[in-house]
Amino acid sequence: MSRAIIENAGEHRVSILINGMYSIENINDVKMAYRDLLTDEDMFIFSAVAPTAYCNIDNHGRSKAAQAARDIAIANIAPDIVYVISFFEGHGDSYTVSIPADDVPWKTVCVCHDLIPLLNKERYLGDPNFREFYMNKLAEFERADAIFAISQSAAQEVIEYTDIPSDRVLNISSAVGEDFAVIDYSAEHIQSLKDKYRLPDEFILTLAMIEPRKNIEAPIHAYSMLPAELQQRYPMVLAYKVHPEGLERILRLAESYGLSRSQLIFTGFLTDDDLIALYNLCKLFVFPSLHEGFGLPPLEAMRCGAATLGSNITSLPEVIGWEDAMFNPHDVQDIRRVMEKALTDEAFYRELKAHALTQSAKFSWANTAHLAIDGFTRLLQSSKEVDAGQTEGVTTSRIQTMQKIDALSEVDRLGLAWAVARNGYKQHTRKLLVDISVLAKHDAKTGIQRVSRSILSELLKSGVPGYEVSAVYYTPGECYRYANQYLSSNFPGEYGADEPVLFSKDDILIATDLTAHLFPEVVTQIDCMRAAGAFACFVVHDILPLRRPEWSIEGIQREFPIWLSCLAEHADRLICVSASVAEDVKAWIAENSHWVKPNPLLTVSNFHLGADLDASVPSTGMPDNAQALLATMAAAPSFIMVGTMEPRKGHAQTLAAFEELWCEGKNYNLFIVGKQGWNVDSLCEKLRHHPQLNKKLFWLQNISDEFLVELYARSRALIFASQGEGFGLPLIEAAQKKLPVIIRDIPVFKEIAQEHAWYFSGEAPADIAKAVEDWLALYEQNAHPRSENINWLTWKQSAELLLKNLPIIAPAAKQ
């Protein structure tokens, strides 16, 4: 119904309000159901403190407070109408709806599905707690500005059994989904269904709902009265799962009517697709209910072309629409009579089949939506102008209500204070929060931290219209806090203390650091921020520890599967630093679908990193021997490698290649720029004692960005021998300086450099040695690939591209 209203709303704006006390999985499902119809801006989540289920008396204070918190959220959305599709809920869970007793600046319209508990108090309201809950809800229900009933029968019940006047009650009918339809199944599919559910070629279908008003005993009794040849030809199939006690009771009942157990077939659990198939395949569908608000099963069956028989009381005549197809559900002889006629009178049976399609076509969600929208329009036309000041008054009065609830603990009150703040949507400026949880604690000056530093710098400098840009960090055992002390130390201006972050609707967390060590603990924080309406987005630099675990330390090998699975299941967006990484991430999630259950809202995209050292908050300073080193570079062809030394980076292979070249008498220099990393102890020891060290081999650690620029400018070419990268910043930095590049032929380098680099393959030293010689030959002829033709971005452009991958809402769109 709600989707149809949105689809047919025309000039009217529709928003949805989601209960933030529900699990993040439920919230995901709701947002997923509407994402093709509504923008994120029109999906609101209200915060409150759970549990609120009325069945536990200890929850009653929180329940009242949750209703007040919801009112504050609604007041900040400022709708004309609040449409409550299901009102009598919340006894067994934290479902929260209410109709204010005071004057509020919106109209409340409730859907009435039925008043069955009210009309059958002995059966349904025997429990004092549930009776109190239901009657309290009924009193609220009567305060609604309008009631939309799903049938004329339900509307009449409202008029007769409540104090709601008839001019406030409207029948909007109901419908079923488009999935319920006549389907021409293949013979193979039909046979598989028969095998799965032990179905005969022809059968009578009814629903095995073990609930008194569903009257399951009556069709079984009537079936037992059919002629033996009809019973033999048409076994009775009872759809849906029945608990063992109920099953045994039905079987004993059938035996008391003279039926054998084999004449009844129980399907057990049915998927929607299989139920639709059974509707299509059955000879006859029988629905003997004693009381319905509408009666979806007969409509479902008729939409599938089934010859349908049903009760002639409450709402079912409206649905079935033909007196001859109905029976008195209290009279088994009447049920038998109509069933037998349908099974023996071919003309009547053909009429039943034809009527099913004609009658079911009268019901659609579009029709229901139009009736509802017309009802909304009439309600608003009869309403007086709303005083804008009433919105603020609602917030004030609801806070006062919360303050007077004695049953709330101090923890409850603190949670409600946060909830009230989150629900004040109007008061918020949206926030773009850059997660620098690693950088804020220690800047190790790795490539990833250079990315974090550069992106943060650009976002702070350029700003994002409609958003406050801040840096945040997470400390295990605490909450997210603003990284104001870090900003004060590294950027102009004063930023204050590291206060806790209040995440609210449309805020965006973008984690540019690699924070695998924080998972899975930080997941609770991520779920909480998303349950407040914020978005959790993460930059993924690579997943090499998952693809090539031998390249990583054991701790990283353990952390990465946890990290990426948590991101897949709990993040909104994964923004990878290259298309290659994005494809790898999507492939890994698919490969591990047996245990990784991704958030249905998750998107995986990519952007490219920047490379202008001047804009990355570069470090400065020149070593004492800088001029001597630069002179050495100029004296002979010099090749440079840049990056932390790790097994995958190819330093050992490159060194061995140059050793071969030196043995051949080649006068080439190799400059290795990068500190010692993991599992390269023997290589580093070899470097420290190498006979060519500081002659033709140079190892420079912890140099400044300023000196690196000078080295780039004087090198003949960059050698990037890495066997795996997420992006490869040195490649872009070299291209920016027009430094030619000799690189390994791997997908991500092909994506970035395309034909503008000299590629090599293989893991033997001779492979790199040959690549260097071949490249030099081209270089001497001025025919080598030109790295300046590689497309690269400034950090400003990279940050802008990152923003395009975030759920940014333009300022003009904010109401």
From Swiss-Prot:
<protein>
    <recommendedName>
        <fullName>Serotype-specific mannosyltransferase WbdA</fullName>
        <ecNumber>2.4.1.-</ecNumber>
    </recommendedName>
</protein>
<keyword id="KW-1003">Cell membrane</keyword>
<comment type="similarity">
    <text>Belongs to the glycosyltransferase group 1 family. Glycosyltransferase 4 subfamily.</text>
</comment>
<dbReference type="Pfam" id="PF00534">
    <property type="entry name" value="Glycos_transf_1"/>
</dbReference>
<dbReference type="GO" id="GO:0016757">
    <property type="term" value="F:glycosyltransferase activity"/>
</dbReference>
<keyword id="KW-0808">Transferase</keyword>
<feature type="region of interest" description="Alpha-(1-&gt;2)-mannosyltransferase">
    <location>
        <begin position="1"/>
        <end position="374"/>
    </location>
</feature>
<keyword id="KW-0472">Membrane</keyword>
<dbReference type="GO" id="GO:0009243">
    <property type="term" value="P:O antigen biosynthetic process"/>
</dbReference>
<keyword id="KW-0328">Glycosyltransferase</keyword>
<dbReference type="GO" id="GO:0005886">
    <property type="term" value="C:plasma membrane"/>
</dbReference>
<comment type="pathway">
    <text>Bacterial outer membrane biogenesis; LPS O-antigen biosynthesis.</text>
</comment>
<keyword id="KW-0997">Cell inner membrane</keyword>
<comment type="function">
    <text>Mannosyltransferase involved in the biosynthesis of the repeat unit of the lipopolysaccharide (LPS) O-antigen region.</text>
</comment>
<feature type="region of interest" description="Alpha-(1-&gt;3)-mannosyltransferase">
    <location>
        <begin position="431"/>
        <end position="804"/>
    </location>
</feature>
<dbReference type="InterPro" id="IPR001296">
    <property type="entry name" value="Glyco_trans_1"/>
</dbReference>
